[in-house]
Amino acid sequence: MSNDFKVIINGQNIDNGQKIIFEKSQDVPKPIFDIGDNEYYTIAMVDPDAPSRENPIYKYFLHMLIVNNYQTLVSFQPPSPPKGSGYHRYFFFLLKQPKYIDQNIWKQQINNNSIRREKFNLSEFISDNKLTVIASTYFKTKR
C-alpha cells in the first residue's frame, strides 16, 4: 500500500506478495517506516491462513506485535505452516496510533485475552485502540 513501509527479512526487502523459501522466513523481520515528531505506530504480523487457507480456524494467527514504534509487546514467532497446507500469507500492518499508549494498557489486553496469538481479532484490535491502517505488505511461504 505504501512505498514508505518496508519489511526486511534475511537481509532482503520483501515485495508485496513475494514467495519466500521457508527457511529464510524464519529470521526476525525488520519493519522500516518513517516516523514524524510525536507519531506512534503499531506493527502487527498475522497469518490469515492458519492452519490452512481452506480451513482458517485460527485466523488471524498473531506472529508479532510491536507498539509505540519499536516496543515489542508480542515477540516474533516464526512462520510454521503445516506441511501440505500450501502457501500461507503473512501480512504486516502498519497502524498509526492516536498517541503514545502506556505499556500497562496493552498488557491488560493480553491479560484479559483480547490479545492472543490464535484467533487474534485484528479488526477489533484496530477499533478498540483507535488505530488507523497506514500501509500493509505480505509474503507467502510453505513447507
UniProtKB/Swiss-Prot annotation:
- What are the UniProt keywords, alphabetically? Lipid-binding, Virion
Cellular localization per UniProt: Virion
Kindly indicate whether the keyword Magnesium belongs to this entry.
no
**Where on the tree of life does the source sit, at the highest rank?**
Viruses
Its lineage opens with: Viruses, Varidnaviria, Bamfordvirae, Nucleocytoviricota, Megaviricetes
Give the organism the record lists: Acanthamoeba polyphaga mimivirus (APMV)
Protein name, UniProt field: Phosphatidylethanolamine-binding protein homolog R644
Q: Does the keyword field hold Secreted?
A: no
Question: What do the Gene Ontology cellular component annotations say?
Answer: virion component
Instruction: Give any Pfam family that matches.
Output: PBP
Q: Which family does it belong to?
A: Belongs to the phosphatidylethanolamine-binding protein family.
In terms of InterPro entries, this protein maps to: PEBP, PEBP-like_sf, PEBP_euk
Give an example GO molecular function.
lipid binding
